């Protein structure tokens, strides 16, 4: 038995407006996951970019920490890289870069079928690379598994027998390269003296002083400034000690943190490499 026409009319035409969703006609906007979930799938944190940061700082009276001219701020601002021992990410300037090169035999000829992983001082895009913690003690404790430090792309396309890491010279080679670079630069670089406001003082103190220290000293008209002190006596390297101690007037060598960035970075890496964990 069908419904009467009055019932159809009541259901289809005379439907109360209170049950109708007035917003049902509005189409939901399509939002790309590139925008909504970027930080999740890309493993990158959200960042804010401003057209004119200096103007914004002055307009809203914000405190400017001037990290661009800060030695440690520059180190921490380097790109994040995953290192092979702890499997965690860290700032690139706080790690040891490793490069993949063809292995050479006793006849000093390169063997195309074998690859060798060696430490280097600076990152370069010209070769495949990976990273490990910049610590002599940690590297020494994990040298037995050094073949796992190769880049993933190399591990996936090579056999274990074709990969080589010389564990007997790995630490000494990296240490020698660091010291050679520092000696060469310190031999020709000028001592700026305490005139530079943004400065690093190199000293040689074999007593139980920290390898790196931040001091507050007076400058100019008695205004307090901070300076970093790198104690190269911590390295027990006679050649470096002789270079640093040659100027008896200033009791060390002053470096300009703005003009000697590369040297200061490698000095920091050397002290970090030898620090006790």
UniProtKB/Swiss-Prot annotation:
Keywords: Mitochondrion. InterPro entries: Rrg8 (IPR031415). Belongs to the RRG8 family. GO terms for biological process: mitochondrial genome maintenance; mitochondrial tRNA 5'-end processing. The lineage of its organism: Eukaryota, Fungi, Dikarya, Ascomycota, Saccharomycotina. It comes from Saccharomyces cerevisiae (strain ATCC 204508 / S288c) (Baker's yeast). One of its GO terms (cellular component) is matrix side of mitochondrial inner membrane. Disruption phenotype: Decrease in plasma membrane electron transport. Coiled coil: none annotated. This is Required for respiratory growth protein 8, mitochondrial. It comes from the Eukaryota. Required for respiratory activity and maintenance and expression of the mitochondrial genome. It is found in: Mitochondrion. Present with 2140 molecules/cell in log phase SD medium.
């Amino acid at each position: 038995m069908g419904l009467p026409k009055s019932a159809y009319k009541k259901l289809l035409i005379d439907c109360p407006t209170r049950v109708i969703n007035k917003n049902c006609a509005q189409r939901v906007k399509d939002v790309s996951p590139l925008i909504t979930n970027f930080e999740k799938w890309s493993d990158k944190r959200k960042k804010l970019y401003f057209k004119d940061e200096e103007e914004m700082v002055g307009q809203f009276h914000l405190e400017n920490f001037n990290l661009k001219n800060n030695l440690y701020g520059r180190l921490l601002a380097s790109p994040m890289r995953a290192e092979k021992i702890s499997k965690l990410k860290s700032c690139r300037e706080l790690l040891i870069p490793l490069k993949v090169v063809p292995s050479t035999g006793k006849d000093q000829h390169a063997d195309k079928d074998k690859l060798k992983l060696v430490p280097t001082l600076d990152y370069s895009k010209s070769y495949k690379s990976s990273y490990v913690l910049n610590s002599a003690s940690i590297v020494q404790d994990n040298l037995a598994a050094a073949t796992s430090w190769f880049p993933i792309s190399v591990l996936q396309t090579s056999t274990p027998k074709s990969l080589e890491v010389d564990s007997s010279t790995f630490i000494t080679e990296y240490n020698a390269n660091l010291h050679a670079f520092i000696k060469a630069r310190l031999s020709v670089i000028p001592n700026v003296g305490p005139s530079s406001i943004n400065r690093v003082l190199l000293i040689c103190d074999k007593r139980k002083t920290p390898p790196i220290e931040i001091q507050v000293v007076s400058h100019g008209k008695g205004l307090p400034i901070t300076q970093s002190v790198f104690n190269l006596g911590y390295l027990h390297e006679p050649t470096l000690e002789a270079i640093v101690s040659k100027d008896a007037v200033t009791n060390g060598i002053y470096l300009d943190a703005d003009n000697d960035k590369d040297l200061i970075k490698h000095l920091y890496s050397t002290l970090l490499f030898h620090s006790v964990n």
